[in-house]
Amino acid sequence: MARCIPSACSKALLGASLLLGPAQANPWQQARFPVPQFSGYTSHYGLRTGASGGSSLHRGLDIAAPLGSPVLSWWAGRVERLINDGSCGIGVAIRSGPYEHLYCHLQGTIEQDTLRSGGASLRQGSWLRTGEPLGAIGVSGRSSGPHLHWGVKLNERWLDPVLLLRAMADARRVETPISQARP
């Protein structure tokens, strides 16, 4: 598993600043949690045991939310590919510099090279801003209930999305003025 401590990931992000937008003192402030209406995490990154008893590497974080809830782009980037298969179901992969972020189990359809989900319409090569809706929570593919499977690669290596969420939370804590901090 690739480690993504804030300093290491920040360097990778700053190195891709032309694609990702203007550099900031803390680039993690630009990132956005992909499921604003989430209700919990149902499966974490790492080894897990399946119903058949075998173990496999789960390359992402499963985020439960009500069916049809919006899914947002974690970071600005280009749609690299649209996915429609038995595992991911309806999904999209977005390229943001050294990062590829994957969104699976979306509601909707892919027809004529266009993903239509939750009011969003995406084609390969489309540009998305950080926080822009890219689809809606669904149950497509291998899914036992409504959720988003969110996978992230850094320089083509899978990493634990929880590390990104921690870096985002740390960035926001650093920037919260003391007068706004809760006791």
Identify the residue ranges that each predicted region occupies.
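Bacterial N-terminal signal peptides that target proteins for export
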Residues: 2-13
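Bacterial N-terminal signal peptides
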Residues: 11-21
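Surface-exposed, glycine-biased beta-strand/turn segments
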Residues: 23-91, 96-97, 129-130, 139, ...
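Conserved beta-strand positions that form and line the central face of beta-propeller blades
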Residues: 62, 93, 102-105, 136, ...
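Short histidine-centered loop motifs in beta-beta connectors
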Residues: 72, 82, 98-131
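Histidine-centered catalytic micro-motifs
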Residues: 145-152
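Short peripheral tails and domain-boundary helices/loops at the edges of structured domains
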Residues: 153-174
